[in-house]
């Protein structure tokens, strides 16, 4: 079977993103997932256009961000159960974020707001590890101001 060039490029891109995510995984984001599961989640976000990748001038990846459109009462099960995005949902679950430094983090945040401006009017949900356990966090727009202005 011969694959079109764009498919080969897409697979190479996804593999590059997966490698970056694995390299920067701290055990709190993908929590024991194997490489194939991470590849599947990256490809899923690429296909549904909820994947941002920040590069430097030489095309080295410096940051990756993936999110879900959901409702305020959705939690980690929404992700684990592979539920489809709720396009009319009232919230955005900021699920997977890897960044090499403050500048990359800022650029990802700006790109996210540009690509998904509705984030400024929707609930923002995330998980953070506190005392060794994941805890649901509800963020405000102050988070974005703090990131961009620091």
What are the roles of these predicted feature ranges?
Residues 52-55, 64-66, 124-129:
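A structural signal for short, well-ordered beta-strand segments and their strand-loop junctions
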Residues 74-144:
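Acyl-donor binding region in acyl/amide transferases
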Residues 59-65, 92:
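Glycine-rich phosphate/pyrophosphate-binding loop shared by adenosine-nucleotide-utilizing enzymes
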Residues 39-57, 68-74:
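A short helix-loop-beta-strand connector motif used in the catalytic cores of GNAT acetyltransferases and
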Residues 21, 25, 41-45, 112-120:
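Hydrophobic, Leu/Ile/Phe/Ala-enriched alpha-helical segments that form helix-helix packing faces
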Residues 2-3, 7, 143-150:
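Mixed-charge, low-complexity intrinsically disordered regions
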Residues 1-37:
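Short amphipathic alpha-helix that is part of the acyltransferase structural core
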């Amino acid at each position: 079977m011969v694959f079109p060039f764009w498919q080969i490029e897409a697979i190479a891109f996804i593999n590059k993103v997966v490698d970056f995510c694995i390299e920067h995984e701290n055990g709190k984001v993908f929590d024991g997932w194997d490489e194939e599961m991470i590849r599947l989640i990256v490809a899923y976000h690429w296909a549904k256009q909820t994947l941002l990748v920040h590069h430097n001038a030489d095309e080295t990846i410096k940051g990756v961000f993936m999110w879900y459109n959901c409702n305020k009462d959705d939690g980690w099960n929404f992700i684990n159960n592979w539920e489809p995005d709720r396009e009319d949902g009232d919230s955005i679950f900021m699920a997977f974020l890897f960044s090499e430094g403050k500048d990359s983090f800022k650029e990802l945040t700006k790109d996210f707001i540009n690509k998904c401006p509705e984030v400024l009017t929707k609930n923002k949900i995330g998980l953070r590890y506190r005392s060794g356990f994941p805890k649901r966090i509800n963020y405000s727009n102050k988070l974005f101001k703090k990131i961009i202005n620091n």
